[in-house]
C-alpha cells in the first residue's frame, strides 16, 4: 500500500514529524510532496532538503509548479491537485494523510482513503504559521535540522568586567550556548 502527504512544510515542525511517522508506519511506501512557490518566505529548496534529512526512509518529492487555479476553495482544486499528485508519484495511491480539511476531498479525487491525523492538533498544538510568527516561543516544536534557520547570533564586545556574565545570561535566557570570554585564551 502507498500513502501520500502533501504540504508546504514552511517550516517542518514536530506536528509534521508526527504526521509523517504515523503515515510511514501505516503504509509500505510513503510519498511526501513538498509544495513550494518562489515567493514564499522560506526557500522551497531548503524545505525540501530539511524533509529529506528528517525522513530519509520515505520518498520526498519537490513540487515547484505554481498552480494558481488550485488554491484552496477554488473550483475543482482537488481534481487539479490530484492530477499533480498522480504525475509526481506515478504509483497507485491508497491513502492520503493530513491533519487539515483538504485531505478528505483530495483523497476522494485520488480514489484513496483519507486518514486524518491529529486534526484538532491536540498532540502537537502548533502550526507552521505560528512558528514563522514567533519561532522562539515555539522552539521546542522545531526539529534540530531546522533550528539553525531561526538561530540568531549575538556578539557581546565590551571591556567592562561588569558585563562579563552577559553572554552566559543571554544564553540561559534564550536556551542556547555561549562562548566564554576570549581574553582568557589570549593571555595564555
Give, region by region, the residue ranges found by the protein language model.
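Nucleotidyltransferase catalytic core that binds NTPs
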Residues: 1-154
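Conserved substrate/cofactor phosphate-moiety recognition/catalytic segment
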Residues: 168-188
